Amino acid sequence: MAGGKCIALIAHDQKKDAMAEFARRNQDVLADWHIVATGTTGGRVLDACPDLKVTRLKSGPLGGDQQIGAMIATGDIDMLIFFIDPLTPMPHDVDVKALTRLAVLYDIPMALNEATAERLIKTLNH
């Protein structure tokens, strides 16, 4: 994936519908990018937008967050969009913190909510 444009998409369970809708609304822009996503999120995005190039990794609790973190560290991810659910307790909260830390450390654009994601998406392909 080196040299390509790649966006990582992750969404907590209560935000997966919002992520699928976000992808559907922005599929014209996302079509020019390769997408990696945690397993269930990637499946939901593909259901909404079957023509997008999506690589599904493991589910977040099974290591998908760490797979995306490793891709950030190797320079294979250019942007992270992670719709978090602040109202639901997360048993894998440390994974969220680790992923956020890597995005900050490697200085990649990161959105943790839909409003920020919409603004970031508008900067692509310009």
Swiss-Prot record:
Single Gene Ontology MF annotation: methylglyoxal synthase activity
Binding site for substrate: 12, 16, 38-41, 59-60, 92
Reactions that this protein is recorded to catalyse: dihydroxyacetone phosphate = methylglyoxal + phosphate
Domain MGS-like: 1-126
GO CC terms in record: cytosol
Any one Gene Ontology BP term: methylglyoxal biosynthetic process
Active site: 65
E.C. numbers: 4.2.3.3
Keywords: Lyase
Keyword Glycosyltransferase: no
Cited Gene3D superfamilies: Methylglyoxal synthase-like domain (3.40.50.1380)
Keyword flag Lyase: yes
Function noted in UniProt: Catalyzes the formation of methylglyoxal from dihydroxyacetone phosphate.
Similarity remark: Belongs to the methylglyoxal synthase family.
Name the record gives this protein: Methylglyoxal synthase
Source lineage: Bacteria, Pseudomonadati, Pseudomonadota, Alphaproteobacteria, Hyphomicrobiales
Gene field: mgsA
